[in-house]
From Swiss-Prot:
Residues 5-54 form the F-box domain. The lineage of its organism: Eukaryota, Viridiplantae, Streptophyta, Embryophyta, Tracheophyta. PANTHER family: F-BOX DOMAIN-CONTAINING PROTEIN, F-BOX PROTEIN INTERACTION DOMAIN PROTEIN-RELATED. Keywords: Kelch repeat. This is Putative F-box/kelch-repeat protein At4g22430. Kelch repeats lie at residues 168-210.
Length: 413
């Protein structure tokens, strides 16, 4: 990292930089309008890397959602300093006037939205910065979205994104093939390829996007004897689509969920059983094997369903009490817990108890062995650690609406 030159002007600029870099991103964004010099300084690689380095131990804002409904939100972090929940930025989103858009997938602060009615326009963007890139129509017929993945640099700044769609599967020489259409922000074009699919009837709902890879939860059925994850990597080494069974599986009433934490896909399971109730947590290693991280005896865990994990702290798991209808965070290392009650008492977070109660009963209700529906998956919308503009293809115009950070972000040339 280069240091400023030792001149009076550079020393003064260095002092200003040292002050600004310790502010939250919401405050820093306002100083970009002071002058072109300040704007250039804030958008420099030096400033960005210094900010990320100083805030590396601070959580970024994040939220748990199901479609556009928000369950829980932590927006009062030091990185962004947002005044309200992340979900409220999606609710305020206005594109194409009155048309309603639906959340489909998210990765590193970017989300993929598609319009419910009329022409099927689709956008990838950042609702907080209010920047959007329109995705052109896919050349394939009868396609549907799989998700969005992102490519990042060494400090987690988003450099590019890819939108993935799939077509109708077909049988060839005894193997099932899946057509894939991939749109890249680096080229502005769709490419088509076909991969051998290890799952005969794949599920593409509620994808998990992490490290340039899409993970799709697959239920156990007559074709897939064990539930697991179908994995598609779009930024790593070229691989065919492959399947990973979930660990320690049995078709029973034990509640499970899938989430991400500290850069890993995590699998959480509660076991209500004679002789002791357990909470078990695994992480996925190299997209090939599960590693058991925690096995904790918790007497009261039988009436709880796992919801998710903290995206930056792999010791924190979030549980929902069916009996008492409240949210609880549990620290696996210290075994301390916190019950979230009246949301008015939490100034830096938002808990939507009505949404939690309605949907958690529906998606984790008691079921019989024959009705096994797989792990709970809630979308973790996590803002990146820097307010970089949404990557856009060459010659494609950025759509900028009024920024909810009190800043109109203009296209970068």
């Amino acid at each position: 990292m280069e240091k400023p030159n030792n001149t009076i002007t550079d020393v003064l600029e260095g002092i200003v930089t040292e002050i600004l870099v310790r502010l939250p991103l919401r405050s820093i964004s306002r100083f970009k309008s002071v002058s072109q010099t300040w704007k250039s300084a804030i958008e420099s690689v030096y400033f960005r890397r210094l900010f990320v380095s100083l805030h590396q131990n601070t959580s970024s804002s994040w939220s748990l959602l199901l479609r556009k409904e928000e369950f829980i939100d932590f927006h009062g972090c030091g990185t962004w300093g947002l005044p309200k929940s992340l979900g409220s930025y999606i609710q305020c989103m206005e594109l194409d006037g009155k048309f309603e858009y639906m959340w489909f997938s998210g990765s590193n602060g970017l989300i993929l939205m598609h319009r419910k009615l009329g022409t099927w326009k689709n956008y990838v963007g950042n609702p907080v910065l209010q920047q959007w890139v329109e995705i052109p129509a896919c050349p394939g017929s009868y396609t549907f979205f799989c998700g969005v993945v992102t490519g990042v640099d060494e400090v987690g700044v988003v450099l590019s994104f890819k939108v993935v769609k799939s077509g109708n599967m077909f049988l060839n020489k005894g193997e099932m093939y899946m057509p894939l259409y991939v749109y890249s922000s680096e080229t502005g074009f769709w490419i088509h390829k076909e991969v051998v699919c290890p799952v005969r009837l794949p599920n593409f709902y509620d994808p998990i996007s992490l490290n340039g890879t899409l993970y799709f939860s697959q239920r156990g059925d007559s074709y897939n004897r064990r539930p697991g994850l179908m994995v598609l990597d779009f930024y790593g080494k070229p691989k065919d689509c492959h399947f990973i069974p979930l660990p320690d599986h049995a078709l029973n009433r034990n509640k499970t969920c899938l989430a991400t934490s500290s850069g890993f896909v995590m699998y959480i399971k509660t076991l209500a059983q004679p002789g002791g109730n357990l909470l078990k947590v695994w992480r996925l290693i190299d997209d090939s094997a599960w590693q058991l991280m925690w096995e904790v005896s918790i007497p009261f865990i039988g009436c709880y369903a796992p919801m998710s994990m903290h995206p930056f702290d792999r010791n924190i798991v979030y549980l929902w009490s069916h009996d008492n209808c409240y949210l609880m965070s549990f620290n696996l290392q210290t075994q301390n817990y916190k019950i979230f009650g009246d949301e008015s008492k939490h100034h830096d977070c938002y808990i939507n108890h009505r949404t939690c109660e309605k949907h958690m009963y529906k998606i984790s209700r008691p079921y019989s062995v024959s009705e096994y529906e797989g792990p709970i998956i809630l979308q973790q919308w996590v803002l990146s650690r820097w307010m970089q503009s949404v990557p856009r293809p060459p010659e494609v115009e950025m759509i900028d609406t009024t920024s909810l950070l009190s800043l109109v972000v203009k296209n970068e040339e």
